[in-house]
Amino acid sequence: MLVKVPILGRETIHVGYGVRSHIVETIVGLKSSTYVVINDSNVGRVPYFQELLSDFEAQLPAGSRLLRYVVKPGEANKTRATKEQIEDYLLSEGCTRDTVIVAVGGGIIGDMIGYVAATFMRGVRVVQVPTSLLAMVDSSIGGKTAVDTPLGKNFIGAFWQPEFVLVDIKWLQSLPKREFINGMAEVIKTACIWNADEFQRLETHADEFLHVVNTPKISEKEGFQLYDTDIESIKEHIFKLVLESIKVKAEVVSSDERESSLRNLLNFGHSIGHAYEAILTPQALHGECVSIGMVKEAELSRYLGILSATQVARLSKILVAYGLPVSKDEKWFRELTLNKKTPLDTLLKKMSIDKKNDGSKKKVVLLETIGKCYGKSAHVVSDEDLRFVLTDETLVYPFNNIPRDQNKTVTPPGSKSISNRALVLAALGKGTCRIKNLLHSDDTKHMLTAVQELKGANISWEDNGETVVLEGQGGSTLVACENDLYLGNAGTASRFLTSVAALVNSTSQKDHVILTGNARMQQRPIGPLVDSLRNNGIKIDYVKNEGCLPLKVHTDSVFKGGRIELAATVSSQYVSSILMCAPYAENPVTLALVGGKPISILYVEMTIKMMEKFGIKVEKSTTEEYTYIIPKGHYVNPAEYVIESDASSATYPLAFAALTGTTVTVPNIGSASLQGDARFATDVLQPMGCSVTQTATSTTVTGPPVGHLKPLKHVDMEPMTDAFLTACVVAAVAHDNDPTSKNTTTIEGIANQRVKECNRIEAMCTQLAKFGVRTNELPDGIQVHGLHSINDLKVPSIGNEAVGVCTYDDHRVAMSFSLLAGMVNSEQPNSSNPTPVRILERHCTGKTWPGWWDVLHTELGAQLDGAEPLELNSMKNAKKSVVIIGMRAAGKTTISRWCAAALGYKLVDLDTLFEERYGHGMIKDFVSQHGWEKFREEEARIFKEVIENYGDAGYVFSSGGGLVESSESRRILKSFSKSGGYVLHLHRDIEETIMFLQKDPTRPAYVEEIREVWNRRESWYKDCSNFSFFAPHCNSEVEFQNLRRAFTKFIRTITGVTTVDIPTRRSAFVCLTFENLTEYTNSLKAITYGCDAVEVRVDHLSNMDEDFVSKQISILRASTDGLPIIFTVRTKKQGGKFPDEDYETLQKLLITALKVGVDYIDLELTLPIGIQYKVLNMKRNTKIIGSHHDFASAYPWDHSEWENRYNQALAMDVDIVKFVGMAKSFEDNLMLERFRDSHTTKPLIAINMGAHGRVSRVLNTILTPVTSEHLSEVAAPGQLTVAEINRIYTEMGGITKKDFFVVGSPIGHSRSPVLHNTGYSVLGLPHHFDKFETTSAEEVKKHLLDNKANLGGLAVTIPLKLDIIKYMDELTESAKVIGAVNTVIPLGNSKFKGDNTDWLGIRNSLVSNGVPESVSGLSGLVVGAGGTSRAAIFALHKLGCQKIFIVNRTTEKLEELVKFFPEEYNIVPIKEAEEAEAVNETIGVAVNCVPADKPLDAKLESLLERLLLKSSHTHFVSTLVEAAYKPSVTPVMKLAKDKYQWRVVPGAQMLVHQGVAQFETWNNCRAPFKAIYDAVTEI
């Protein structure tokens, strides 16, 4: 099997299967002294490559030599640097002009090695041996060669034709399935632009291809996965698709080698595809992006009126059939690309960098039909048209550019109703039926897929996809399918297929069929149909919610027939469903419609007429109304069946004519139509003032002059219910000449429209209101009150904010409002900047008329544009609320207050809100009167209301413990969390909770025991929440404050208020391998000294239960002051204790980590990809560390294993890469450092374990894993403490000893030296802190600033805080505003920065004692007016105090203080008791800055007492910080605490906090706070 394909006049492309010997013969036929085989290390592992190499060596000509060069794999190595290394190798080996280079590999190798050949010795011969499908059909052919640059891919290269391209299909046997499928994009592309026959052949073989490619055998060799795909079984198909694709490219290249015109046709799908690829790489592959690009560019061709909707549908279908994405929003593709956004402006910017472009004009290849491009080169397209195609939100501009004499003919697509019925009838019928004008839409796509899945008929296509051919087997081949039948939002398909499923036969593996759909489909009713089928012997289960999909239809039950009664007042489709399947029942069927007049009876008559066309005649009962008699039998398929155009869809172009005063003709719908909606023109538009001409087969409408439509007083639209939406938008601008008239159009007979894709009546009322149109909802209809003038139509808005028209994912809502949107401002003169109307979710029109927007734009002349989704803009401003759920006594009340304080949110207790709404007592009173069921119903209603109104408004909702008892409340919780809201499950030890609840008399008693309640609710709490916090019972004030700080950090982190910042400096984390952290809480602070994070090794915990693990995380948070946590589950093969194959438990643990909001998760790169991407897509604000360990020391640092793992980590877009090797010698550390230097794309933790590897831990730059002297054993071989690392690094010259001083006078009792030297000692730093006593700033400058080369910094105290400023080159904001410097920071080159950390001492003292980081809405108090008072005012302003009250013994200084600060600080001096009494604000924080060595002034004390009383209504305990270090309890502290129950913080804390701030600023590392505090405060 070998075919030679000519290109540029020579047969240099050879295509075969298993042609290894031919490849070698062909290469050695190129006479040379030197052959150089270049490949990457991945290809080098493939057995077929080794065989090729062996053959090459065996056949090497005498006197010739074979050289080999292996490059690192991946796009990251397709660089000028790699090219240079290859060239240096060739030169070092003495290669000359006669060298033949053989490039064996995929596109990266082919491109780069081709470029090497093009430039080495000014050009040497090259042979391409492509090993991937993409390389075989694309990159290896045509002579394009290149390398990447930091600014873009393939920017530097040359055209250099290879001597041969030797394609051996057998290589594909070892290709990973995703790479295989990726290559199919280029194969489909070439068929699409050039070869219609090959495209049709590809359509036919898609299923078998995907089955084979999806089921490879996978083996592992040295940690590398080897694929073995059974391409032998589809060899002919694979060979043909590769060959035909190559032929197309070869022909095009031969005609246009340098890509001046024709060759750029090969870029179909690439203009848009490359733009997506630029954003989504490396997660998305080239072919995947090109696949999306092809669909978008085909849609653009359709939008411009060039390509038919059928052809777009074919292209989309074949791409899906071969496993490729057709939209970036497909769930699997979105998860694969980690939910990356593709902003519209970014896409257009990326598209502007394209070699096809004409300067700034963007060019795109357009498609005329499958197999043929439009023209011979790419075409210029406008940004406006591109924006439209690239987005799902449409801007409709005023229709003021439509000529009033415009006369258009519009042919709508085939009827959805008739299309779906025809497919069912033909699938059940016997014989071949050619169905023409079938609607190509989402609905029919789902129906066709279902027919194929159920083996109902053989389906093929003719007339280039315009005709579908069904070869029916009379229903005998219907069998249960393996997969669920997913029907999207296709209501018609779901109802028809429910009855079809009743006729399906079981297989040996399956005895049921599952029918399911999207979220909306799972809300739409199907109960009456199910009830009738159940009563007739069919066993059907509701999988989820009663009365809705998903359904489980058991195929071992029998459709008995006989009399069937059906309630048909909701949907006529129930009737049609049973009618069409009735002939196949065991007995003749009598179908009686009960419950009142059936809805949409014309659709029932349509079904009966169609059944007659297929050979079954239904008789109407002569004795019972609405009763039908269906005989037993089989359908006989007519040879041809032509689908009539959709009459519902025809209403839109006809209404366009009515609204714009133009003429539109629909040529194939008239009075003889099967469809009731054909009456729309005569029954609705004509009475409203339109001129209507209708024949048996056509309808023409001419509208009156714009603004002259008349309201329709009453119309019964029961025969054409789907058309009522169109009537509503026409009625919106219809008015009488009477200015007192309400211009009311009344529409009735449409009750069924409430249960369509959405509640359409409610939808029209809601959306019309946005335009300023009033409506009334009727029991079975709607009243629309038309505007007096068309100029009164408003651009939709809520308040002053423009909003989009919501379409509810409903095609008819979208198409209707696309018409009204264009009438807004349509009578205004053309404006250079008109305001368009935004329509959301435009793609929903694909359900019945995918090309509607194209018709509106291209045929009817509307100006449309695309726009970035509103949600991207609104989400930035939204403050997603927090709902806290959990059992009573879980701490919800307390923690809800903390939550509100931490976020600055408003707090609402839902139980309290219920009681306020109830107004007659407490919840227990309501329950006593109405019962629990009614309470849950009302509770859910109120909850729904608050979420709808305040879910994005920054609230904390504290819920009752039983909120989750209601299924409706659970649905709301899940929906809220899915939309980005925070549902926090708060829990604690259940045994302690039970003990507490048994003593609580304040709530209504439960009938069940509390434990049973917990057992029932536990799973609900977990299912409904997206975050979880374990709140242990606190036994002391210290534990309580620790818990508060831990929770505050947790809630601020998960909500994104504070971010997890990856350190950019030298940093470390300590590894904890305890079985239970509870036993070590007192030592955890000491263990974590100097660390920037703490790792909990979950694989070492004694219990893997979710609650236990959650408790461990909370304990760790509270015991380490919220130090960032690294959550690690280390598997055995990666050096841990967790079982390697227990992936289910591992995934649960990782999801638990995300729910408890850990800062980092260590994610092993060897885990299954499904687990990895689940975590990556759920991570929110958690950072991911992609880790890989080589305990066996199997791979030196220059081995490709590390390169592959690094590329894998990049593709996963982890936040940090962590690689750990095992050093055998010191040289291993040097190799590691070379690796570190060349891999800087992501933050990298790279170390060697073992005694030889210790130096690598010292040299590692960020987050080095460390142990502690307080731990009994190390977590890994060779671990060092922070102090050991610093000491070794100092000895190596990495840290230079610095001297620090406290300057001022008197400083004899200063605790600064003790403070700082303790920190240096604990952390192993070489620095020293001393005293320099002086009252002269000049002395400080002379002896320290000018002459101390190793000066590390100065702590400045009185009297120098002002005098030192003149010697500072820079001042921080705090130093400027406070007007004093207490910290000097050397900048180098004899320059210094002045800072003030006194304010941080105050702020951090408050925050560490329970005050939120933001106290927005509260006020503060400062006692005193000296220098420290200025720091206090600055601190309270930074905390967010809305007002700062100041009091002092002498009032003169108060005015000076007020003038000192900017006006926005809102400082209010209090001088008299009356002023203090008049204060209405809540004071939550205070700082005392008056000296403590003398009694408190009486007047000052009186003022202070009055102000301390103003502390109610805070979400935290009001807190006062004392600035004086001694005594430990001052008079102000005693007053505040004992008399007014304020929390007081002694001055020692402020002293230490400000000193620690200095320490961390100077040394750029975390200070050991507790050790320092203990040293400073010891007597």
Swiss-Prot record:
The keyword Oxidoreductase applies. PROSITE patterns: DEHYDROQUINASE_I, EPSP_SYNTHASE_1, EPSP_SYNTHASE_2, SHIKIMATE_KINASE. One of its GO terms (biological process) is aromatic amino acid family biosynthetic process. ATP binds at G886, M887, R888, A889, A890, G891, K892, T893. Its cofactor is Zn(2+). NAD(+) binds at residues 40-42, 75-78, 106-108, 111, 131-132, 153, 171-174, 182. It catalyses: 7-phospho-2-dehydro-3-deoxy-D-arabino-heptonate = 3-dehydroquinate + phosphate; 3-dehydroquinate = 3-dehydroshikimate + H2O; shikimate + NADP(+) = 3-dehydroshikimate + NADPH + H(+); shikimate + ATP = 3-phosphoshikimate + ADP + H(+). Its EC number is 4.2.3.4, 2.5.1.19, 2.7.1.71, 4.2.1.10. Residues 1-383 are annotated as: 3-dehydroquinate synthase. Pfam families: DHQ_synthase, DHQS_C, DHquinase_I, EPSP_synthase, SDH_C, Shikimate_DH, Shikimate_dh_N, SKI. Binds 2 Zn(2+) ions per subunit. Residues 1072-1284 are annotated as: 3-dehydroquinase. Pathway: Metabolic intermediate biosynthesis; chorismate biosynthesis; chorismate from D-erythrose 4-phosphate and phosphoenolpyruvate: step 2/7; Metabolic intermediate biosynthesis; chorismate biosynthesis; chorismate from D-erythrose 4-phosphate and phosphoenolpyruvate: step 3/7; Metabolic intermediate biosynthesis; chorismate biosynthesis; chorismate from D-erythrose 4-phosphate and phosphoenolpyruvate: step 4/7; Metabolic intermediate biosynthesis; chorismate biosynthesis; chorismate from D-erythrose 4-phosphate and phosphoenolpyruvate: step 5/7. Zn(2+) binds at E186, H270, H286. Residues 396-862 are annotated as: EPSP synthase. Keywords: Amino-acid biosynthesis, Aromatic amino acid biosynthesis, ATP-binding, Cytoplasm, Kinase, Lyase, Metal-binding, Multifunctional enzyme, NADP, Nucleotide-binding, Oxidoreductase, Transferase, Zinc. GO terms for cellular component: cytoplasm. It is found in: Cytoplasm. GO terms for molecular function: 3-dehydroquinate dehydratase activity; 3-dehydroquinate synthase activity; 3-phosphoshikimate 1-carboxyvinyltransferase activity; ATP binding; metal ion binding; shikimate 3-dehydrogenase (NADP+) activity; shikimate kinase activity. InterPro entries: 3-dehydroquinate_DH_AS (IPR018508), Aldolase_TIM (IPR013785), Aminoacid_DH-like_N_sf (IPR046346), DHQ_synth_AroB (IPR016037), DHQS/DOIS_N (IPR030960), DHQS_C (IPR056179), DHquinase_I (IPR001381), Enolpyruvate_Tfrase_dom (IPR001986). The AROM polypeptide catalyzes 5 consecutive enzymatic reactions in prechorismate polyaromatic amino acid biosynthesis. PANTHER family: AROM/DEHYDROQUINATE SYNTHASE, PENTAFUNCTIONAL AROM POLYPEPTIDE. Homodimer. In the N-terminal section; belongs to the sugar phosphate cyclases superfamily. Dehydroquinate synthase family. This is Pentafunctional AROM polypeptide. It comes from Candida glabrata (strain ATCC 2001 / BCRC 20586 / JCM 3761 / NBRC 0622 / NRRL Y-65 / CBS 138).
